[in-house]
């Protein structure tokens, strides 16, 4: 045996002793790596096998999961029973799950929130009707089949397809067939199964005294809600096309769209004739375009709803009413007792004027009090007299306004807004206005006060330059048109409100004035607008009046406005309105321009509310007479008579009305009554202390366009 050879026992001993230990460890490590690779490969293969096939169609998301899948948060399908329930053996109990209600749906029944619209849809009205029919019918009498809740959206024939009776008079200028579009309150329902269609069988005789089939129905049928939102036929909404998962959401969306699109389709007629009213016995009447505005609701033609359309309110059986379409028109409304009822939003009145106090709206408690007018139209829609005498139910009526009694002459516009765009040919010369304002301020105010006003105007001068440097002549003309159009709109508000109001340009020139402001200050409208000469000598001095002896602060009245010419168009005279600075005392003028500098290009919706002192309009003759009366009062000669004489002078300044001194009432302290009392404010010192609020309105170029000011005297 070779010395290098070993026996098997020796090899085993060497292995035990560790001589071959490194080779064994390397072998074990190699096996572990191979096993790890195999496990990773198996996992990768399993993951690839479990991955979705990219070529298979994408699963469509289910609109609503079933109850079992909803509880288990599993993916469900639209079919019922779903595949998961079939695999688990729950196919008999597979039904749609109920979602968590939103806050605005807490009062809605669960049946309404179920997906889909079918014949078994929950309906309060039909549920109550079925209960009543089931209790009132005997087992031996066959019951009439009730129509399902799902109504077809097929449009019914138009109104003009109904035949007319020859004994009914009809004016060709009125009626829905002459409208360009359908009324917004016009849900078209199909005629019921039990009602004959007059279009399909026009030759069938129809009695004028025939009442709808719902006339003999039990009152319990009409105890449900007046507006049933669960009816899918409401205004013929196609809920399937709206692709809503929620039934209530689809109805809400459809109703909003109906109101938004239906309001603009109202026929162009008098606003009073379009108002829907609830006439006698709850009949919904809608005046036609040709109806007289003074026509009472009982004489107006029922346009859409008949008496059966209001049974939810009156709780009485309907009464037949002959309409413009003859007796056959009752067939349309005869089957509407089990249909939803709704009204569209009507348009607002065309003017802001209110009727007289004796023509105010009232709640008429007796339908017999409706006044019949001789010019109510060529047709009549009065109910049967024998039936109307049996029941006199309280009804709600629209205001019975007579057209001839509407006193709107003082507030009615005499011109059209389009005339503004035709009359404005040249831009307004704001440069001349600012030059005139600067000259007036230098003449009236002291150098210190003039400097404060100049600093305020200088702070906004760069903004004016920056906003107007890119404007050409056409832009300036357009700016003046915008100003005149806005001023035209403000005239109604000034006349409607009783607050002393003035509107002036950004230069401070008066552009509009209310009657109350003239009564308060004595400044006539023609003088403020520059149409008549300004002879005011009151500049708010210590005595309130300026005499010839005063040197500083005196102001020479401007000549007649026709002598002042526009620098841009010297051929035509330029009227010079009164400046706002002429209406306020010195401190109020300075405070106004300092506030104007902050608000002109600041907050576009901001306003300033503070106090001021308005200057009364005083001429030199008034100052001489008042100075003489004051001298007599100081001398102790008939002071009371001089005070009465001063009050007498006050009665003839704003409106030109004179007051007799003997019949003049002596007002007590704090007493104000009528125009005379308003004129008496501030007459002694020529100043009226007021609280006023003003704001700046800008034009389309973001430039201050006009200033609106409201005054209230401090009494």
Swiss-Prot record:
It comes from the Eukaryota. Residues 66-94 bind DNA. Keywords: Activator, DNA-binding, Gluconeogenesis, Metal-binding, Nucleus, Transcription, Transcription regulation, Zinc. GO terms for biological process: cellular response to starvation; gluconeogenesis. GO terms for cellular component: nucleus. InterPro entries: ERT1_acuK_gluconeogen_tf, PAS_13, Zn2-C6_fun-type_DNA-bd_sf, Zn2Cys6_DnaBD. SMART domains: GAL4 (SM00066). Its main location: nucleus. Residues 386-400, 650-662 have a biased composition (Low complexity). It is found in: Nucleus. Pfam families: PAS_13. Residues 1-14, 129-166, 179-191, 203-223, 362-385, 535-554, 639-649 have a biased composition (Polar residues). Transcription factor which regulates nonfermentable carbon utilization. Activator of gluconeogenetic genes. Belongs to the ERT1/acuK family. This is Transcription activator of gluconeogenesis MGYG_02011.
């Amino acid at each position: 045996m070779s010395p290098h050879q070993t026996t098997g026992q020796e090899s085993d001993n060497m292995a035990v002793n560790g001589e071959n230990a490194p080779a064994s460890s390397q072998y074990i490590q190699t096996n572990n790596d191979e096993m790890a690779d195999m496990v990773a490969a198996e996992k990768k293969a399993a993951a690839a096998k479990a991955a979705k096939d990219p070529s298979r169609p994408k699963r469509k998301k289910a609109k609503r999961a079933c109850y079992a899948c909803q509880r288990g948060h599993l993916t469900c399908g639209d079919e019922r029973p779903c595949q998961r329930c079939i695999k688990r053996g729950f196919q008999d109990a597979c039904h749609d799950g109920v979602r968590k209600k939103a806050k605005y749906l807490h009062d809605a029944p669960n049946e309404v929130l179920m997906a889909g619209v079918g014949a078994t849809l929950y309906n309060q009205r039909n549920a109550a009707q079925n209960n009543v029919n089931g209790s009132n019918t005997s087992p031996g009498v066959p019951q009439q089949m009730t129509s399902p809740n799902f109504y077809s959206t097929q449009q019914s024939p138009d109104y003009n397809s109904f035949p007319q009776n020859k004994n009914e008079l009809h004016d060709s200028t009125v009626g829905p067939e002459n409208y360009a579009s359908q009324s917004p309150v016009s849900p078209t329902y199909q005629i019921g199964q039990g009602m004959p269609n007059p279009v399909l069988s026009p030759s069938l005789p129809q009695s004028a005294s025939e009442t709808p089939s719902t006339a003999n129905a039990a009152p319990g049928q009409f105890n449900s809600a007046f507006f049933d939102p669960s009816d899918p036929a409401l205004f013929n909404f196609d809920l399937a096309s709206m692709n809503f998962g929620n039934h209530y959401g689809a109805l809400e969306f459809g109703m909003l769209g109906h109101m938004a699109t239906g309001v603009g389709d109202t026929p162009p007629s008098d606003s009073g004739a379009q108002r829907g009213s609830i006439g006698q016995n709850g009949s919904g009447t809608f005046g036609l375009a040709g109806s007289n505005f003074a026509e009472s609701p009982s004489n107006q033609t029922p346009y859409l709803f008949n008496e059966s359309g209001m049974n939810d309110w009156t709780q009485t059986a309907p009464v037949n009413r002959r309409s413009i379409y003859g007796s056959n028109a009752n067939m349309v409304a005869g089957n509407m007792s089990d249909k939803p009822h709704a009204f569209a939003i009507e348009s607002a009145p065309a003017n802001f004027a209110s009727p007289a106090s004796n023509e105010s709206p009232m709640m008429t408690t007796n339908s017999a009090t409706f006044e019949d007018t001789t010019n109510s139209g060529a047709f009549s829609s009065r109910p049967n007299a024998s039936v109307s005498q049996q029941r006199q139910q309280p009804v709600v009526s629209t205001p019975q306004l007579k057209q001839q009694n509407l006193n709107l002459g003082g507030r009615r516009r005499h011109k059209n807004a389009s005339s503004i765009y035709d009359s404005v040919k040249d831009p307004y010369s704001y440069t001349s206005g600012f030059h005139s304002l600067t000259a007036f301020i230098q003449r009236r105010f002291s150098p210190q006060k003039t400097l404060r006003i100049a600093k305020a105007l200088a702070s906004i001068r760069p903004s004016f330059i920056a906003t107007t440097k890119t404007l050409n002549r056409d832009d300036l003309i357009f700016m003046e048109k915008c100003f005149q159009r806005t001023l035209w709109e403000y005239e109604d508000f000034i006349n409607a409100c009783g607050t002393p109001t003035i509107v002036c340009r950004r230069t401070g020139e008066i552009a509009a004035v209310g009657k109350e402001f003239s009564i308060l200050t004595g400044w006539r409208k023609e003088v403020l607008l520059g149409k008549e000469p300004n002879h005011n000598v009151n500049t708010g001095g210590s005595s309130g009046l300026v005499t010839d002896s005063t040197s500083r602060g005196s102001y020479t009245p401007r000549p007649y406005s026709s002598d002042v010419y526009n620098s841009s168009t010297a051929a035509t005279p330029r009227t010079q309105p009164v400046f706002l600075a002429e209406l306020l005392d010195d401190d109020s003028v300075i405070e106004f321009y300092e506030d104007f500098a902050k608000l002109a290009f600041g907050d576009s919706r901001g306003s300033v509310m503070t106090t001021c002192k308005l200057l009364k309009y005083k001429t030199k003759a008034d100052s001489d007479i008042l100075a003489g009366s004051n001298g007599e009062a100081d001398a102790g000669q008939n002071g009371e008579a001089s005070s009465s004489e001063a009050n007498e002078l006050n009665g003839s300044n704003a409106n030109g009305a004179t007051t007799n001194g003997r019949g003049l009432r002596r007002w007590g302290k704090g007493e104000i009554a009528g125009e005379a009392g308003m004129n008496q404010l501030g007459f002694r010192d020529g100043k009226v202390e007021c609280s006023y609020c003003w704001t700046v309105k800008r034009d389309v170029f973001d430039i201050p366009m006009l200033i609106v000011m409201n005054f209230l005297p401090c009494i």
